[in-house]
Amino acid sequence: MDKLRMTGGTPLNGEVTIAGAKNAALPILCACLLTDQPVVLRNLPDLQDVRTMLKLLQEIGVVVSFPDANNPNHVILNAAVIKSSEATYEMVKTMRASILVLGPLLARMHSAKVSLPGGCAIGARPVDQHIKGLKAMGASIKIKSGYIQAETKPTTERLKGASILTDMITVTGTENLLMAATLASGTTILENAAREPEVGDLAELLVKMGAKITGIGSDRLVIEGVEKLHGAEHSVIPDRIEAGTFLCAVAAAGGEVLVKHCRPDTLDAVIVKLKEAGLKMEIGPDWIKASMQGRPKAVSFRTSEYPAFPTDMQAQLMAVNAVANGNSTITETIFENRFMHVQELNRLGADIAIEGNTAIAQGVERLSGAIVMATDLRASASLVIAGLAAQGETQVDRIYHLDRGYDRMEQKLTRLGANIERIK
């Protein structure tokens, strides 16, 4: 099992190019199921989760082709023939986002059988809002033997437009219902919809495919169903979480880095907090030049739905707070059980205590290298950031979590001057 070994204490300097967003790529890949025509995607991130999704789509019958064998970021998906409307437990257990095939399969094939999902162990993340919304659109749904079994009644019928108010803001729920609604008969209104940029990116592709959607970027999406969608070309939005992760690395380790091919307009809450921490930033339309000298200042924050501070950046900013001057409180409101990185940061010499859904960090002048273990995707990124700021050698085990959401992070860090390597 791969590990990362690094010797900290070296400032980061140079340029880093941000990949396409994992959290946009996964629903966008599933959108190809809505049409029998080819969908061409560019800026697709080369990640384990993306490869898993491509494999799942191939099992369903999608023909996946790479025009350039040396470029995994450009792919053509052709779902002309759907062989199976089932997403098996073997495929779904490794990645929660597999649930995103449910809406498209149900909308196009009028039936779907999808295993209840797995993925990162950071909370329940129930799929009840997906089921509630699809039922409102006329689907008959049973949960049997660990599978969601959904069909329209009769199975020749399309889904029907409906007004749907989810009980909570759910990103994958919004995406599933949005995709299903594009092929429904009549108009669907999604109230309390997730406003994340990745949801907007999916909606932009669906519009290119012939969907009629208004309210993109707001919490009220109106979808006028059409009988058929067609093929389209689309470039996946840059990954705001990867960009934020590298900004946190500069804040913790020091140095000057130009973060290229990013979308600063999707990072407002992160930028505000990092400025508070003392990170100096010049911001352009698709780049951020970040520099840090000395220790960061401690910043308190709470996670919430977009456009507030993202839960997917909580662990990384906590690593910055671990070496910051002062004390901070970090409150997690999205997922329970998302402080598993705290005990690992403390192994490196951090002083962080947990009280309910709040972590209290007392910044220390320096961390000391140690062997630590990644527990989930963003936790692994926080341990890498802490290792870069620590004195001595740090080893991060179980980095398969990291590979699910970051494209060769250690190579990008090496180009910034970090002393880091992947070992077996």
From Swiss-Prot:
<dbReference type="GO" id="GO:0019277">
    <property type="term" value="P:UDP-N-acetylgalactosamine biosynthetic process"/>
</dbReference>
<feature type="binding site">
    <location>
        <position position="96"/>
    </location>
    <ligand>
        <name>UDP-N-acetyl-alpha-D-glucosamine</name>
    </ligand>
</feature>
<feature type="modified residue" description="2-(S-cysteinyl)pyruvic acid O-phosphothioketal">
    <location>
        <position position="120"/>
    </location>
</feature>
<dbReference type="Pfam" id="PF00275">
    <property type="entry name" value="EPSP_synthase"/>
</dbReference>
<comment type="function">
    <text>Cell wall formation. Adds enolpyruvyl to UDP-N-acetylglucosamine.</text>
</comment>
<dbReference type="GO" id="GO:0071555">
    <property type="term" value="P:cell wall organization"/>
</dbReference>
<feature type="binding site">
    <location>
        <position position="334"/>
    </location>
    <ligand>
        <name>UDP-N-acetyl-alpha-D-glucosamine</name>
    </ligand>
</feature>
<dbReference type="GO" id="GO:0008760">
    <property type="term" value="F:UDP-N-acetylglucosamine 1-carboxyvinyltransferase activity"/>
</dbReference>
<feature type="binding site">
    <location>
        <begin position="22"/>
        <end position="23"/>
    </location>
    <ligand>
        <name>phosphoenolpyruvate</name>
    </ligand>
</feature>
<protein>
    <recommendedName>
        <fullName>UDP-N-acetylglucosamine 1-carboxyvinyltransferase</fullName>
        <ecNumber>2.5.1.7</ecNumber>
    </recommendedName>
</protein>
<keyword id="KW-0133">Cell shape</keyword>
<keyword id="KW-0670">Pyruvate</keyword>
<feature type="active site" description="Proton donor">
    <location>
        <position position="120"/>
    </location>
</feature>
<keyword id="KW-0961">Cell wall biogenesis/degradation</keyword>
<dbReference type="InterPro" id="IPR001986">
    <property type="entry name" value="Enolpyruvate_Tfrase_dom"/>
</dbReference>
<keyword id="KW-0131">Cell cycle</keyword>
<keyword id="KW-0963">Cytoplasm</keyword>
<comment type="similarity">
    <text>Belongs to the EPSP synthase family. MurA subfamily.</text>
</comment>
<dbReference type="GO" id="GO:0005737">
    <property type="term" value="C:cytoplasm"/>
</dbReference>
<dbReference type="GO" id="GO:0009252">
    <property type="term" value="P:peptidoglycan biosynthetic process"/>
</dbReference>
<dbReference type="GO" id="GO:0008360">
    <property type="term" value="P:regulation of cell shape"/>
</dbReference>
<dbReference type="InterPro" id="IPR013792">
    <property type="entry name" value="RNA3'P_cycl/enolpyr_Trfase_a/b"/>
</dbReference>
<dbReference type="InterPro" id="IPR036968">
    <property type="entry name" value="Enolpyruvate_Tfrase_sf"/>
</dbReference>
<keyword id="KW-0808">Transferase</keyword>
<dbReference type="InterPro" id="IPR050068">
    <property type="entry name" value="MurA_subfamily"/>
</dbReference>
<feature type="binding site">
    <location>
        <begin position="125"/>
        <end position="129"/>
    </location>
    <ligand>
        <name>UDP-N-acetyl-alpha-D-glucosamine</name>
    </ligand>
</feature>
<dbReference type="GO" id="GO:0051301">
    <property type="term" value="P:cell division"/>
</dbReference>
<comment type="pathway">
    <text>Cell wall biogenesis; peptidoglycan biosynthesis.</text>
</comment>
<keyword id="KW-0132">Cell division</keyword>
<feature type="binding site">
    <location>
        <position position="312"/>
    </location>
    <ligand>
        <name>UDP-N-acetyl-alpha-D-glucosamine</name>
    </ligand>
</feature>
<dbReference type="InterPro" id="IPR005750">
    <property type="entry name" value="UDP_GlcNAc_COvinyl_MurA"/>
</dbReference>
<keyword id="KW-0573">Peptidoglycan synthesis</keyword>
